[in-house]
């Protein structure tokens, strides 16, 4: 985490993060524009998107910008890692053909019409009326396992209606916690049920999904039917995991590069390869870590190389704490290392983390949340405190404001290199930034008393340079993909 002297400049008016935008104001199938976050149709979550990599030069129409991932330097150029990379490279030779085969189908375009929906990576198109109708039509059944979601800052449970082709809140009438457990399981949570309760409907909804308690032993969403009334006028608020809370109650704001105290950022993990800190990550469940895709590029794509450490502030003390081996590494299937689009990956741990005051999960963002243009966010990590510096021994954290996509894409900053799957954050004066070693770590914000993961540290041009803010993977566009992986690999 790099620091330069100077006060932050003013940022400007409010804007809407379209990754969170309410569905009713979204067009049915928007074009991808360079200066904004994706808008998603009401009837489904966004289909998967691409990823990122080490130290590349991206050509721009004006000056050339050297973009550097925030991992611990170039893995195979550091003298301390040269022998490691040579050994790992030997293991990748036999898999080269398989990787090449994967590359052949990575980049595909949707051919579905506006009245159809796409079945994940298979590219099959089905009518939107068949989505969540109780019969699997997609090759992998995606149309029947993406039928429930949590909405907004209050975690309102919503279910998709295939007849109405829209999402509706679930009425509290006849609801019980057993249904809450079923809904959490449908989303991909494993034995993490936290709580459900009825809360007053403040959205002005005129339609609901209600339980048919006599429908027998079938999937939860098959028990629900569309209704224009809800006698209790209460809707279900569902928490599948206690996330986004800290044990410490700090009153002072972190403005730049302060050493973290125990429990400040309990979702932060350090990801090691053979005893070396390489990247950061964020805890979202006892078994799952969110990190950056460029962290796990070859030769580090195999889970056997990775160890996660949680709840420890100093790198020098990591090996005195508990370590967790990684069981699976799942990089986004459309990861593009050249354009740096959609830099996200997941790690599943062999054994679950034990949550305590020092180890807690952060919340994944829900659809329907809004962010201000200069929304205060926080970054944390063990990255270098200056460009080309060494990894920090102690965990550092700093506040950075969001930057409007159109401003970040101006020719004086990143000149249209920022896609809807990226978020810019920092001070244009260059006072605070993430740096090498921070890659994959969290960009979080506090709303409604809850900490939300809205970005993973991705890339930038240098560290804390003027007009070169940090760039982060836009987690708001990846939540559906994350839930898909949790379901498929539970």
UniProtKB/Swiss-Prot annotation:
According to the UniProt topology, which residue ranges lie Extracellular? 105-490
The record's disulfide annotation reads 112-125, 119-138, 132-147, 171-230, 184-240, 243-363, 279-295, 408-424, 435-463
Question: Where is the site labelled Cleavage?
Answer: 253-254
Q: What cellular-component terms does GO give this entry?
A: extracellular region; nucleoplasm; plasma membrane
Sites carrying a glycan are: 111, 212, 474
What residues does the SRCR domain cover? 150-242
KW Acyltransferase (keyword) present: no
Q: Which reaction does it catalyse?
A: The enzyme cleaves angiotensin-converting enzyme 2 (EC 3.4.17.23) and cleaves influenzea A and B virus and coronavirus spike glycoproteins at arginine residues
Alphabetized, the UniProt keywords read:
Autocatalytic cleavage, Calcium, Cell membrane, Disulfide bond, Glycoprotein, Hydrolase, Membrane, Metal-binding, Protease, Secreted, Serine protease, Signal-anchor, Transmembrane, Transmembrane helix, Zymogen
Q: Which residues cross the membrane?
A: 84-104
EC category name: hydrolase
SUPFAM superfamilies (alphabetical): LDL receptor-like module (SSF57424), SRCR-like (SSF56487), Trypsin-like serine proteases (SSF50494)
Topological type in the membrane:
Single-pass type II membrane protein
How does this chain assemble?
Answer: The catalytically active form interacts with ACE2.
Recorded family membership: Belongs to the peptidase S1 family.
Q: What is this protein called?
A: Transmembrane protease serine 2
* Protein's organism: Mus musculus
Native organism taxonomy: Eukaryota, Metazoa, Chordata, Craniata, Vertebrata
Gene behind this chain? Tmprss2
């Amino acid at each position: 985490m790099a620091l330069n002297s100077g006060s932050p400049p003013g940022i400007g008016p409010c804007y809407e993060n379209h990754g969170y935008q309410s569905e009713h104001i979204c067009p049915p199938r928007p074009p991808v524009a360079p200066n904004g976050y994706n808008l998603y149709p009401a009837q489904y979550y966004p289909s998967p998107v691409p990823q990122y990599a080490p130290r590349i030069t991206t050509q721009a129409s004006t000056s050339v910008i050297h973009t550097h991932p925030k991992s611990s330097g170039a893995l195979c150029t550091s003298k301390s890692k040269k022998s490691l990379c040579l050994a790992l490279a030997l293991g990748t030779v036999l898999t080269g053909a398989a990787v090449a085969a994967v590359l052949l189908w990575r980049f595909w375009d949707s051919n579905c019409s506006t009245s159809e929906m796409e079945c994940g990576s298979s590219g099959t198109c089905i009518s939107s009326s068949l989505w969540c109708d109780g019969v699997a039509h997609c090759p992998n059944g995606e149309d029947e396992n993406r039928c429930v979601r949590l909405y907004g800052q209050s975690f309102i449970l919503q279910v998709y209606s295939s007849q109405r082709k829209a999402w509706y809140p679930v009425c509290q009438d006849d609801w019980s916690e057993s249904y809450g457990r079923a809904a959490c399981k449908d989303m991909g949570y494993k034995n993490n049920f936290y709580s459900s309760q009825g809360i007053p409907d403040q959205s002005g909804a005129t339609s609901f999904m209600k339980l048919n308690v006599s429908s027998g032993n079938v999937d939860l969403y098959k028990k629900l039917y569309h209704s224009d009334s809800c006698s209790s006028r209460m809707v279900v608020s569902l928490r599948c995991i206690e996330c986004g809370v800290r044990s410490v109650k700090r009153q002072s704001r972190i403005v730049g590069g302060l050493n973290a105290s125990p429990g400040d950022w309990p979702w932060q993990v350090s990801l090691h390869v053979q005893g070396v800190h390489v990247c950061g990550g964020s805890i979202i469940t006892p078994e799952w870590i969110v990190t950056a895709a460029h962290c796990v590029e070859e030769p580090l794509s195999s889970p056997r190389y990775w160890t996660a450490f949680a709840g420890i502030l100093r790198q020098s003390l990591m090996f005195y704490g508990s370590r967790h081996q990684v069981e699976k590494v799942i990089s986004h299937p459309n990861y593009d290392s050249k354009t740096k689009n959609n830099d996200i990956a997941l790690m599943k741990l062999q054994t679950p983390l034990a949550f305590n005051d020092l180890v807690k999960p952060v919340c994944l963002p829900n659809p329907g949340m809004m962010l201000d243009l200069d929304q205060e966010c926080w970054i944390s990590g063990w990255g270098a405190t200056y460009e080309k510096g060494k990894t920090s021994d102690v965990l550092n954290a700093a506040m950075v404001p969001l930057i409007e996509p159109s401003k970040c894409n101006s020719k004086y900053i990143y000149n249209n290199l920022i896609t809807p799957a990226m978020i810019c954050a920092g001070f244009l004066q260059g006072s605070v930034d993430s740096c090498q070693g921070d890659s994959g770590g969290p960009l979080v914000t506090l709303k409604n008393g809850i900490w939300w993961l809205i970005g993973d540290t991705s890339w930038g041009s240098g560290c804390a340079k003027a007009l070169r803010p940090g760039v982060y993977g836009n987690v708001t566009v990846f939540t559906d993909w994350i839930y898909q992986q949790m379901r498929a690999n539970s």
